[in-house]
Every structure is written in structure tokens, then in C-alpha cells.
Design a protein with these regions (language model features):
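Core catalytic lobe of class I
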Residues: 1-260
Length: 260
């Protein structure tokens, strides 16, 4: 097993490569990073100012039916999260990015949606720049809430979550050439055979330089990613170490921002 995939308990006496950044004792670490067990706001206080390039987080959603790890009610959510946001802003580098995956929720007892995540975005935009919003479409999501979707049939399946990209500067470190996708067959044909320059009904002029091969297509801000991998390394490792797995974001979702 490669070293970077090996969990290294700190009682092995192996040097933690991240001790220079934070003085807190990690619960465990690998060559790729350290995991800390505790109150995130308290642990972040030990991180130096302007030292982090990227923060990716998926905090507990304001769900009506509570998870065992705890959830804050929608009406209290914004103030609760701002306590973390202040620390995020402090530790983030000037050209760094904060990426937040946050799902929506329904108002209790009615087929109407809470606006808590939009209210949070408005507050965060007073502190950060809203670089871009992404939409995570998970085709494997269950048809919930059952009362409104499968019983009364008055709503459709909720399969999209917000992913918000925030930054301290309008120009955070980013390069979309690092997340290019394969060209469609139509685009491959245009590159090979050319394109007749003309004006589209929308008014856009499509010129010959449109056929330039840029090594891939720029992806949209809609991310179609399922999270049904029952044999993922995460679940395998939880089973190996007798750890109860928790809900998580898709690894593919994290990779989009780690490589940008």
C-alpha cells in the first residue's frame, strides 16, 4: 500500500509533516494531510493568518429530521455558520478560495422550501467575493421528502445541491485548463473539418477560430456526480479500522476544486 494511503497513528513516532502549520495534535495523518478531532473553530484558531490556499467544507445541513451528528435549525443557521466564516476569512490567503457545499431543506409540515442557504450566501458575500456558484446534480438521490414526492406526488425529486465558490479577492488562484473535459463528437468534427463562420439566431458571431484545439472543453458549473460507490476507498478504510462512516461529499466533487 502506498505511503500516502496509509493511516499513520501519531503513537508510531513518525514525524507529522504538517506540524509547522498547526500546533494541535492530529488524530491521525497521512502524507496527504492530517485529521483533527475537536471543535473546528477552536482548532482553526491555531492556524496562522493568511496561510491556507483552499478550504472545502460541507457543513451539516439545516434538515428537519436531525442526523445523529447534529444539525442547526434553519432559523439559527446563518449566525451559527458566521462563527466559522470569520475564521475561514482569517486563515485564507489573499488569492485563496473557500468552497461550501450546502444542501437545501424543506419547511416543516409544508411542501415549501427554506431559503436558509440563500440567506447564508447573502451574508457571506458581505465578507467574501462570490466567485461563482456551482450546482451539484446527483442522479442517484432518493425521491425525498417522501410525503411530497412519492405519497402526495406534489413535488419532484430534489437532486441538486449548491456549491458556492468564495474568495477574498475578485481574482483567486484558478485555471480552468486544469479541469478540461473531453470534446464532444460534434466539436471533434469541427476541429477536424472546420466550421462555416456565421451569425447564430442568438446574435453571436461564430468565427473560424472557434475550431482551435484547446486540448479539451471548458466544463460548465453544473456537476453531474453520483455518490453511490459502495466499494470506495473511504468505505473500505472505515470498515478496515471499524469506523462508522458518515455522510460525505463526492470525492469527484472535491477534485474539481483541488485541481482548479
Amino acid at each position: 500500500m502506498p505511503f500516502y494511503d496509509t493511516v499513520l497513528p501519531i503513537d508510531l513516532g513518525i514525524e507529522n509533516p504538517f506540524e509547522s502549520l498547526i500546533s494541535a495534535k492530529p488524530y491521525y495523518f497521512t502524507e496527504r494531510g492530517s485529521a483533527y478531532l475537536g471543535d473546528a473553530k477552536e482548532i482553526m484558531k491555531q492556524i496562522p493568518d493568511s496561510s491556507i490556499n483552499l478550504i472545502v467544507t460541507s457543513p451539516p445541513y439545516a434538515l428537519v429530521f436531525k442526523k445523529e451528528y447534529g444539525n442547526v435549525d434553519a432559523q439559527d443557521y446563518v449566525q451559527w455558520f458566521l462563527g466559522f466564516a470569520n475564521e475561514f476569512h482569517r486563515v485564507l490567503k489573499e488569492d485563496g478560495s473557500l468552497v461550501i457545499n450546502i444542501g437545501g431543506t424543506w419547511n416543516k409540515g409544508t411542501p415549501t422550501r427554506s431559503t436558509y442557504q440563500f440567506e447564508l450566501i447573502i451574508e457571506l458575500a458581505k465578507m467574501f467575493n462570490l466567485a461563482q456558484e456551482f450546482y451539484w446534480y446527483n442522479p442517484a438521490r432518493l425521491p425525498a421528502p417522501a410525503e411530497w414526492v412519492t405519497v402526495r406526488r406534489v413535488r419532484v425529486k430534489d437532486a441538486v445541491e449548491l456549491v458556492i465558490w468564495l474568495s477574498k479577492t475578485p481574482f483567486p488562484k484558478a485555471d480552468n485548463r486544469r479541469v478540461l473535459q473531453p470534446y464532444s463528437k460534434d466539436m471533434q468534427r469541427i476541429i477536424e473539418k472546420g466550421y462555416v463562420a456565421k451569425k447564430r439566431p442568438s446574435g453571436h458571431n461564430i468565427m473560424n477560430k472557434f475550431r482551435k484545439d484547446n486540448n479539451g472543453a471548458i466544463p460548465p458549473n453544473v456537476l453531474q456526480i453520483g455518490n453511490t460507490d459502495s466499494s470506495s476507498q473511504y468505505l473500505q478504510k472505515c470498515n478496515e479500522y471499524s469506523i462508522k462512516p458518515t455522510s460525505r461529499t463526492s470525492l469527484s466533487l472535491d477534485i474539481v476544486f483541488f485541481t482548479s
